[in-house]
Amino acid sequence: RGAMGYVLCGALSSSGMFAFLSASPYVYIEYFKVPTEHYGWLFGLNILLMMVVTFANSRLVKGVGAERMLQYGLTVLPLAGALLIYNAWSQTGGLWGIVIPVVLFVGHISLVGANAMTGLMGHFPQSAGTASALAGTLRFGIGAVVGILVNLNPPESPLPMAIAIAACGLGSALSYWLLTGKRARVA
């Protein structure tokens, strides 16, 4: 049960990124009329924050531990998801009202994934390769399903993407807090 909490935590956080990857070209290029040659710059903001967060995690995890870093990431994901839904629903902030919470969400996926994998490995020290392979397979499998679901109906606004990303962030946090037996704690 605890191991499944870590697996689902990592898989659902990654699935939020799959929702973004599937829907963002429509949202940015079609809905907000971003020129196609500028899409890469907006996409790159996600990678930039992901690099910064990954670097910070590599330094901070030694002092505060993987669980605390994971709990921090699992606080950011649902909050970014909630802000994303609010901005998409209320049309607050225009393009940047969508880009900023998406960057916050996607930028923290590597932190959640790495620290969730650390927690999972603690459950399977003798079969870490098998556990890691299963977790990776589920990340891509669930992500593919989420990517398909977010695009089943042609979107008319950023809201379907926002709902999918937020649901993945909340699901990731709930999987951890309900299945691992760890107490919820804001980092």
Question: What do these predicted ranges mean?
Answer:
Residues 22-37:
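Short amphipathic helix-loop junctions that connect adjacent transmembrane helices
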Residues 117-156, 164-165:
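A late C-terminal transmembrane helix in Major Facilitator Superfamily
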Residues 167-187:
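Multi-pass alpha-helical transporter architecture, strongest
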